[in-house]
Design a protein with these regions (language model features):
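Active-site phosphate-binding strand-loop segment of PLP-dependent enzymes
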Residues: 3-51
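Active-site C-terminal subdomain of aminotransferase-like
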Residues: 72-114
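Conserved active-site segment immediately N-terminal to the catalytic lysine
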Residues: 61-72
């Protein structure tokens, strides 16, 4: 999705897409997007990067499968930390990917964090 600076793009639901990922808020312009579920297919996950929105913009957690952020912005926390709210479907997908034989570096192992 491409848009001019300072505007919000719109995701389009497409057949065969299994993850819709987008930022809740664009840091440099402050443009925010509503947190809402995309995709009608039951396996389609909605993943939201909330690094510059967490704690500052209300949202309905049931509208996303993964809402993740690093606390160094809105929470003035140390860098290098990462938090995520994950639905059961997202956790199940993480384990499925980990069990698929795909190489995942240990420092990127989501299942190690769960």
């Amino acid at each position: 999705v491409q848009t001019p600076g300072g505007t919000r793009g719109t995701l389009t639901e497409l057949e065969g897409v299994d993850v819709y990922a987008y930022p809740h808020n664009e840091t440099s312009t402050g443009v925010s997007a509503p947190v809402r579920r995309f995709g009608r297919a039951p396996e389609a996950l909605t993943v939201v990067d909330a690094t510059s929105a967490a704690g500052g913009i209300d949202f309905d957690v049931s509208e996303t499968d993964v809402y993740y952020f690093a606390p160094q912005k809105n929470f003035a926390g140390d860098g290098g930390l990462w938090f995520a709210l994950m639905s059961p479907a997202a956790i199940e997908r993480a384990y499925a990917v980990a069990g698929s034989g795909r190489y995942i570096p240990p420092f990127l192992s989501l299942t190690a964090a769960v």
